[in-house]
């Protein structure tokens, strides 16, 4: 069939998903816009360039903004159930506000309303909120507001569990701060040349966004000087404080000034997080926006299959679904590559990504999928933490997870920021007890898949109801 495999990208004769119309892919104009945005390579230091437009007191500065197209898709109460605050209410720098609005962030989400004013006071925060409800903005906005750009030292650190999430947060940070002339952001993660990072730290860096092992290595070598760090953020704190990372995080905290501010953000808070909080946070402000664990906009189904029927089931689903982009999860790296190959042989364009791939290949797949160059991505749980790709409206668990926490993070890749999404689970005989257990633990209902799935459940254009208005 003439398949080619290159760096996690499998290409065969491409069939459009979703039947007639191709399933609502991004327009060429949108793709070109995405391609033109800055790409943050691992360890790359970027300076937010100030714009040539001079903002004078009294100017109607909002008229100078280059706003993205307004997102008219329906949003659920996960992000619209707010107090009615505006970003201007927080007395933020005008240059920061410009970056916020040019990101398309019109009003603060519930987690942003709760977090931003408290974080600006310097108080520690323990925040629990659903995936895809604006946590990155909740900590990046106060972080950038509190920077003193006259100083040339590291003032804030954001620690994340995966390399891909570090690159994503770096991109957001740079875009939001682009009007703050001189704000310098550096991403540093494992899997890249340590010497390059050492050289970049010779220059001014204000914000470091890193994975735990790499930043601790740089601190121990005396290259990353953290004695002036005033804020550290642990994004996906439950993972960072799991057995894999907790000792590294303890070592990092010990290198920081005693009066630093600590912000913890996660969807789940196990005992390890509580223990860390008791040891290191000082009278933290606690935020809990998790009345229910799963996103309101994600509809969940299961299909009973045998192991041999799984690929056939996918082949049946693809033409019936109105897929914009989909993420398909497997439980091992080997199964990821095998499934990606089979999907390509069926005639569907497919990328794959897992932790055993070389970092530059992972970066390329992540970048290209995010930019809409492929509709389907097969991956391991590497892609469950914080990764935000707004175009994803379908998640398929080809292999059903054993843990409720893993399931929660997987299906949270769709339905981002209050939008609609669909999660389909292929359940074998051996999975049936896990299915029941996860339903009970999350307090959610996973329904049998119907013969025809109502497109209004996961495709915004088919939704008959008007977009929910924010509360006045």
From Swiss-Prot:
Q: Where in the cell is it found?
A: Cytoplasm, P-body; Cytoplasm; Nucleus; Cytoplasm, Cytoplasmic ribonucleoprotein granule
Reply yes or no: does the keyword Ubl conjugation apply. yes
Residues binding ATP: 129-136
InterPro entries recorded: DEAD/DEAH_box_helicase_dom, Helicase_ATP-bd, Helicase_C-like, P-loop_NTPase, RNA-helicase_DEAD-box_CS, RNA_helicase_DEAD_Q_motif
Phosphothreonine, modified sites: 25
The UniProt catalytic activity note for this protein reads: ATP + H2O = ADP + phosphate + H(+)
- EC number(s) for this protein? 3.6.4.13
Stated family? Belongs to the DEAD box helicase family. DDX6/DHH1 subfamily.
User: What's the name of the protein?
Assistant: Probable ATP-dependent RNA helicase DDX6
């Amino acid at each position: 069939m003439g398949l080619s495999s290159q760096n996690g990208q499998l290409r065969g004769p491409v069939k459009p998903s979703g039947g007639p119309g191709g399933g609502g892919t991004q327009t060429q104009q949108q793709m070109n816009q995405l391609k033109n945005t800055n790409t943050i390579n691992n360890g790359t230091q970027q300076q937010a360039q100030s714009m040539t437009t001079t903002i004078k007191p009294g100017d109607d500065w909002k008229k100078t903004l280059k706003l993205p197209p307004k997102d008219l898709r329906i949003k659920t109460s996960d992000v619209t159930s707010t107090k009615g605050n505006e970003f201007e209410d927080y007395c933020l720098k005008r240059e920061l506000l410009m970056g916020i609005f040019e990101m398309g962030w019109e009003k603060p989400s519930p987690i942003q309303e709760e977090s931003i004013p408290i974080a600006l006071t310097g108080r520690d925060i323990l925040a629990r909120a659903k995936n895809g409800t604006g946590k990155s903005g909740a900590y990046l906005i106060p972080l950038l507001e509190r920077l003193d750009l006259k100083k040339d030292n590291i003032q804030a650190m954001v620690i994340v569990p995966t390399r891909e999430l570090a690159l994503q947060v770096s991109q957001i940070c740079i875009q939001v701060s682009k009007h703050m002339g001189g704000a310098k952001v550096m991403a540093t993660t494992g899997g890249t040349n340590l010497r390059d990072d050492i050289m970049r730290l010779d220059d001014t860096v204000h914000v470091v966004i890193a994975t735990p092992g790499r930043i601790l290595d740089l601190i121990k070598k005396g290259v990353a000087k953290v004695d002036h760090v005033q804020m550290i953020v642990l994004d996906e704190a439950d993972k960072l404080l799991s057995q894999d990372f907790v000792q590294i995080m303890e070592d990092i905290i010990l290198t920081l000034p005693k009066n630093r501010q600590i912000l913890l953000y996660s969807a789940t808070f196990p005992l390890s997080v509580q223990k860390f909080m008791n040891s290191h946070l000082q009278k933290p402000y606690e935020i809990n926006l998790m009345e229910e664990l799963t996103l309101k906009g994600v509809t969940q189904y299961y299909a009973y299959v045998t192991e041999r029927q799984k690929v056939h089931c996918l082949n049946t689903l693809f033409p019936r679904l109105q897929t914009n982009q989909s993420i398909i999860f497997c439980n091992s790296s080997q199964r990821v590559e095998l499934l990606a190959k089979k999907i390509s042989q069926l005639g569907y364009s497919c990328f794959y990504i897992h932790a055993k791939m070389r970092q530059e290949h992972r970066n390329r797949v992540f970048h290209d999928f995010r930019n809409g160059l492929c509709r389907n991505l097969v991956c391991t749980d590497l892609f469950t933490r914080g990764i935000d790709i707004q175009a994803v409206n379908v998640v398929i668990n080809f292999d059903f997870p054993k843990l409720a926490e893993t399931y929660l993070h997987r299906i949270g890749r769709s339905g981002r920021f209050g939008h609609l999404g669909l999660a389909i689970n292929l359940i074998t005989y051996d999975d049936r007890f896990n299915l029941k257990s996860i339903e009970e633990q999350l307090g959610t209902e996973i329904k049998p898949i119907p013969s025809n799935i109502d497109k209004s459940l996961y495709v915004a254009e088919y939704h008959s109801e008007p977009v929910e208005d924010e509360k006045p």
